[in-house]
């Protein structure tokens, strides 16, 4: 708003205790500047994974909206989820879904005339050092998660502990980040659904209904499901022990569709962060404070 002091031919004023009148008038130029500023501050953030794409529109006050789209439905984004989405000024993302997914995503962004910036891993960024044998070959989603985890850890602890960063999707990646922000290495194991599907497809007598987690499973369905969860948890706890002799000091950050299922059965401290990759993408793109 623009404040005018004094008289105006069309102003409806009333006396004030200061001897002059204040009249609030909308400034077209100010309104235009506000609209432009809002546009410039909107960033569309993309995490294209193996099975689904997570995305979010980030504004100056945080996330405006968040969404998840199966990879098979990316081609309909502009007609559905993104149909009424405000135009972003910028799009940044990571893509491990392959070239075909990249082409489909870019086609959906064409309606806004926005070309996405695809990010990859590097030797160093945002306080994190990448010790992969060939740093650029580390999955971009894993790199973004490591950056986000380090930012969270340093924001809450003066002396941040070592941490294990887990993305539990189609595959489960388990990455070790030491107290100096150095990524030491990581594991890739089949995800829960992949383990269950593999048993069902390759073992003739194990086509059973979905099971539940039990401390001592007494039926085949529960034995299969509990075994898959325990396999993932065992790999995570082993990585904790490798990075610190006292695994109770190692924080675990979990993201991905199966994160809540796995997190329930891990020793604390555990933090499930739904949009860990998106946070890391924003940090790498220089959009987070």
Indicate where each model-derived feature is located:
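Conserved phosphate-binding/catalytic loops in two-lobed NTP-binding clefts
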Residues: 114-126, 267-282
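N-terminal glycine/serine-rich phosphate-binding loop of ATP-dependent small-molecule kinases
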Residues: 3, 18, 25-26, 30-125
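Adenine-nucleotide phosphate-binding core of ATP-dependent small-molecule kinases
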Residues: 67, 213-251, 258-261, 269-270
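Phosphate/pyrophosphate-binding loops at sites that engage ATP/ADP/AMP, CoA/4′-phosphopantetheine
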Residues: 77-90, 153, 239-250
């Amino acid at each position: 708003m623009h404040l005018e002091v004094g008289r105006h031919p069309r102003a409806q004023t009333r006396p004030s205790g200061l001897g002059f009148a204040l009249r609030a008038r909308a400034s077209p130029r100010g309104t235009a500047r506000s609209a432009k500023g809002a546009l410039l501050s909107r960033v569309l953030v993309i995490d294209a994974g193996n099975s689904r794409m997570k995305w979010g529109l980030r504004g100056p006050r945080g996330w405006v909206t968040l969404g998840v789209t199966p990879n098979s439905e990316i081609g309909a984004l502009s007609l559905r989820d993104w149909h009424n989405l405000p135009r972003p000024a910028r799009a940044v993302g990571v893509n491990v879904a392959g070239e075909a997914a990249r082409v489909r995503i870019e086609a959906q962004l064409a309606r806004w005339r926005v070309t996405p910036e695809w990010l990859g891993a590097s030797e160093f960024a945002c306080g994190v050092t990448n010790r992969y044998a060939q740093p650029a070959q580390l999955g971009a989603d894993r790199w973004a998660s490591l950056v986000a985890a380090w930012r969270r850890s340093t924001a809450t602890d003066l002396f941040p502990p070592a941490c294990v960063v887990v993305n539990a999707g189609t595959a489960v990646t388990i990455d070790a980040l030491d107290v100096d922000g150095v990524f030491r290495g990581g594991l890739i194991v089949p995800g829960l659904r992949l383990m269950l599907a593999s048993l069902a497809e390759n073992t003739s007598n194990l086509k059973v209904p979905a099971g539940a987690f039990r401390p001592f499973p007494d039926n085949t369905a529960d034995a299969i499901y509990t075994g898959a969860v325990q396999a993932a948890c065992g790999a995570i706890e082993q990585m904790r022990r490798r990075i610190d002799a006292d695994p109770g000091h190692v924080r675990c950050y979990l993201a991905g569709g199966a994160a809540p299922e796995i997190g329930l059965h891990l020793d604390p401290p555990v933090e499930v962060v739904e949009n860990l990759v998106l946070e890391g993408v924003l940090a790498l793109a220089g959009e987070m404070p």
